[in-house]
């Protein structure tokens, strides 16, 4: 595709669920910080023309990179929530990124997105009136639990998907939706939710299961295995 996009990568989280004293995006993987793999995966696509990494205020672990694969790599300070950090990143984008331009938002701890999946997201999302997200259909059987921990019932899974990233939307629509949600005190857990709240219906683009997020130590082991397979 010929349309150039910037990517916003919220990386201000502390990784509390991971249980490490080091934020998980900076954990060493084969001698390099995890976030480097994420940034390289995005920068590898020719349509990605710049990266905005949103770091925590006073982040001492960030190495101060300003360029990756010949593309500008900028930083700004994030907020206390993921949504606040995404909003900060969107507002800090350079002037070359216009209000109606599409922007990618991608988790810092999701380092294994395939170039082919990114290509399909950009092709489908930029042709869609709203935008699109990478996602995976739910394939497991889902059970609804009662308050006592027993099974209350089985949920139909035919139309359920697991939302992944990157997610691709127009900058102005995301900014507006995030600002309104913040004013209303509503937590937005992903960008698609922001669009849904505006009455918009983003497109689902199926991607590989290997585009998983590093949330637990087991996930990190899995990513190391994926890296070994590349050799």
Curated annotation (Swiss-Prot):
Show which residues form the site (Transition state stabilizer). Answer: 17, 24
**Pathway noted in the entry:** Isoprenoid biosynthesis; isopentenyl diphosphate biosynthesis via DXP pathway; isopentenyl diphosphate from 1-deoxy-D-xylulose 5-phosphate: step 2/6
Q: Which processes are annotated in GO (biological process)?
A: isopentenyl diphosphate biosynthetic process, methylerythritol 4-phosphate pathway
A Pfam family it matches: IspD
Single GO term (MF)? 2-C-methyl-D-erythritol 4-phosphate cytidylyltransferase activity
Q: Catalysed reaction per UniProt?
A: 2-C-methyl-D-erythritol 4-phosphate + CTP + H(+) = 4-CDP-2-C-methyl-D-erythritol + diphosphate
Q: What is its EC number?
A: 2.7.7.60
Enzyme class, top EC level, equals transferase
This chain's function reads: Catalyzes the formation of 4-diphosphocytidyl-2-C-methyl-D-erythritol from CTP and 2-C-methyl-D-erythritol 4-phosphate (MEP).
Q: Which family does it belong to?
A: Belongs to the IspD/TarI cytidylyltransferase family. IspD subfamily.
Do you know which HAMAP family this protein is assigned to? IspD
Name of the protein in question: 2-C-methyl-D-erythritol 4-phosphate cytidylyltransferase
């Amino acid at each position: 595709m010929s349309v150039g996009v910037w990517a916003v990568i919220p990386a201000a989280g502390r990784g509390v669920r991971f249980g490490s004293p080091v934020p998980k995006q900076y954990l060493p993987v084969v001698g390099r910080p995890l976030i480097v793999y994420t940034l390289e995966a995005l920068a590898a696509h020719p349509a990605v023309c710049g990266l905005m990494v949103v770091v925590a205020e006073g982040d001492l672990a960030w190495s101060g990179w300003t360029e990756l694969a010949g593309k500008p790599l900028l930083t700004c300070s994030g907020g206390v929530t993921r949504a606040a950090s995404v909003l900060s990143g969107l507002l800090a984008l350079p002037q070359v990124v216009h209000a109606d331009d599409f922007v990618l938002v991608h988790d810092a701890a999701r380092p294994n997105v395939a170039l082919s999946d990114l290509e399909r997201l950009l092709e489908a999302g930029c042709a869609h009136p709203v935008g699109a997200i990478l996602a995976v259909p739910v394939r497991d059987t889902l059970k609804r639990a009662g308050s006592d921990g027993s099974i209350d019932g089985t949920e139909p899974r035919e139309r359920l998907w697991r939302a992944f990233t990157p997610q691709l939307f127009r900058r102005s629509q995301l900014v507006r939706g995030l600002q309104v949600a913040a004013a209303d005190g509503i937590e937005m857990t992903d960008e698609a939710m922001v669009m849904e709240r505006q009455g918009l219906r983003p497109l689902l683009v199926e991607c590989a299961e290997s585009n998983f997020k590093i949330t637990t130590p087991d996930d990190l082991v899995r990513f190391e295995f994926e890296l070994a397979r590349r050799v």
